């Protein structure tokens, strides 16, 4: 059982979604998916029923009772510390994997959708391989013109209980904060084909082998279409694999038969943004960047220095303007920056030596991002060597 919610939760408000399951002729107690808000330290909760046969871990409730569960109930708690603000839930969904799942194939489809390509190696390494889900979620939104960074998604959905970004419920909630209807689902081939037919790419969970890993691991990929190879009379699927070595290798194909063997059935659906819905994310602050006497750089707002706080545990990086018109900001090449004890940022010595125009980004642990542009001074040109003195031809003695 997987539960999803999309909600607006202003500052000093939060949402808590709970569920209970009818299994073994009795209702379990309420199981909480954790208190949630964009600027709140979100933590998933491990819980279980009294007999231990129904348990919640992260974003999934598992029913081990013989015969499974036959009923579920959902409860949403809204809380606020501000008399003038309240959270609002726009979408609430529950997805169940049946014990006896009669899967359908649907009608063959030949359609390809655009989906931006992002790979793990080009983005924040803090979350390791579990950065795959924020990369796919950013791609799903950016195909509609959002231009959000995967790091913004990652820190807006991070599960503080595990310091990871693998919680799909928090991923759907983060996309909902950006204004996109988004929910978890269990899908068969017919469902996947229906999503692509409706012009919607989706995130799919695939069990596959990763280089350096002994056992297969779950990877979130972006499904962007289906096709047919007339040469070998075989169907195939079009995927974005964020574990590829580079952005250019993210687009890949897989034989449909192989895909259905590795596909777990878990998926995340995302629909276009609703214009009438106010979005809480992305939360960006335009800043200036000023140089201190020690060579570090500080964000500045309205003439006031805005140092990164002591508890800053997010991502700070810069991208050099290379003259290339990238499809999205996330396609740029990022280089990490070091935070100073005073809250400033340090450019690498080689970048200071090269100079140039740079964009600087700092995403904090809530997903809020400071953005600034700066032009580093160009290095001085080396002084020209003095010309060697030339002899006057009239003073040169003829050879003997």
Where in this protein do the model-derived segments appear?
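Conserved active-site-adjacent core of cysteine acyl-enzyme catalytic domains
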Residues: 152-276, 338
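Surface-exposed, short loops/turns at beta-strand junctions within beta-sandwich domains
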Residues: 64-68, 349-356
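Short, compositionally biased P/S/T/A/G/V-rich stretches that sit at domain boundaries
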Residues: 273-306, 320, 324-327, 379-382, ...
């Amino acid at each position: 059982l997987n539960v999803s919610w999309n909600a607006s939760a202003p500052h000093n408000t939060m949402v808590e979604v709970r569920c209970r399951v009818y299994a073994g002729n009795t209702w379990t107690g309420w199981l909480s998916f954790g208190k949630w808000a964009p600027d709140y330290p979100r933590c998933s909760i491990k819980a279980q029923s009294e007999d231990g046969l129904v348990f919640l871990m992260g974003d999934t409730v598992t029913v081990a009772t013989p015969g499974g569960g036959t009923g579920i109930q959902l409860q949403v708690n809204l809380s606020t510390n501000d008399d003038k603000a309240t959270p609002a839930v726009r979408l609430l969904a529950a997805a169940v994997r049946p014990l006896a799942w009669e899967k359908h194939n649907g009608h063959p489809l030949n359609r390809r959708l655009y989906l931006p390509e992002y790979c793990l190696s080009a983005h924040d390494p803090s979350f390791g391989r579990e950065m795959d889900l924020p990369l796919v979620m950013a791609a799903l939104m950016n195909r509609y013109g959002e231009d959000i960074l995967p790091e913004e998604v990652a820190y807006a959905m991070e599960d503080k209980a595990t310091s990871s970004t693998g919680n799909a419920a928090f991923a759907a909630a983060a996309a909902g904060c950006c204004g996109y209807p988004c929910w978890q689902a269990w899908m068969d081939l017919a469902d996947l084909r229906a999503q692509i037919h409706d012009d919607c790419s989706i995130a799919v969970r695939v069990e596959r082998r990763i280089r350096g890993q002994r056992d297969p691991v779950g990877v979130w990929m972006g499904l962007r279409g289906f096709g047919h190879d007339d040469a070998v009379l075989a169907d195939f699927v079009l995927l974005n694999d964020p574990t590829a070595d580079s952005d250019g290798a993210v687009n890949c194909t897989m034989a449909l038969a192989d895909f259905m063997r590795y596909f777990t059935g878990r998926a995340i659906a995302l629909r276009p943004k609703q214009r009438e819905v106010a979005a809480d994310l992305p939360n960006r602050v335009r800043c200036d960047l000023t140089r201190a006497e020690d060579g570090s750089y500080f964000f500045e707002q309205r003439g006031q220095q805005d140092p990164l706080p002591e508890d800053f545990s997010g991502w700070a990086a810069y991208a050099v303007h290379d003259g290339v018109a990238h499809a999205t900001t996330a396609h740029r090449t990022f280089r990490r920056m070091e935070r100073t004890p005073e809250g400033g940022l340090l450019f690498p010595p080689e970048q200071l030596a090269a100079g140039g125009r740079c964009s600087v980004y700092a995403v904090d642990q809530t997903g809020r991002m400071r953005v600034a542009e700066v032009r580093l001074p160009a290095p001085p040109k080396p002084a020209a060597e003095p010309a060697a003195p030339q002899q006057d031809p009239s003073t040169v003695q003829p050879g003997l």
